[in-house]
Amino acid sequence: MTEQGNLPTQRVNISTQKMLGGIGYILMLLGWIPGIGILLSIVGFVLWLISMYQLSNILRKPSIFQKVLIAFILSIVGMVIALAFGLMAGISSFATMGDETGAILGLGLGVIVANIVVYAIILVAFYFYKEAYDILAQATAHNLFKIAGLLLFIGAITIILFGLGALLIIVGNIVLVVAFFTAPNEVEVKGT
């Protein structure tokens, strides 16, 4: 234990948590594989979530996990809203089968509103992920977490520009995996 700015610090080992995070994130990214991809994504998400929870506790930064949890809940809300609008649009198109103009207008307007609402929710969710990675970067003195969070957030903002946003999200995901595996095994934690 050392003294740093009148606050005692101690070195803590985060090697298990960073491995869980890195492996979990890789598994989440394998969701596109037919058949087993969904299972890999779920297992990966659980590993990543455990990693973020444990890092939050070990580093004495509860806001890391709080922000991850808020982002996750917002992502779920966004998916539920998208699904609800999709179902409502489908049902309304059947209800107006005799009136093609009304059906097309209602369906189009529903899709536009749903996209705007979901886009706004996803932006807020990605902002909270970015904030969590900023805190993690500061706590571990490993700036790749901050860079990954920024790339993911900018990617979410620019996703409406088709390829650019998707490309930034892909790069952000790769940087995040690298950040987990290259983070230091031991870090200084302030407090008792």
Predicted regions span which residues?
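Membrane-interface extramembranous regions at the lipid-water interface
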Residues: 2-32, 40-81, 101, 121-156, ...
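Membrane-interface helix caps and helix-loop-helix hairpins in membrane proteins
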Residues: 34-35, 160-164
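Membrane-helix interface motif
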Residues: 80-97
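Extended assembly-interface regions of large multimeric machines
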Residues: 83-87, 101, 105, 111
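Flexible coil/linker segments and helix-coil junctions enriched in charged and small residues
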Residues: 94-106, 158
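Hydrophobic alpha-helical transmembrane segments
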Residues: 105-122, 159-162
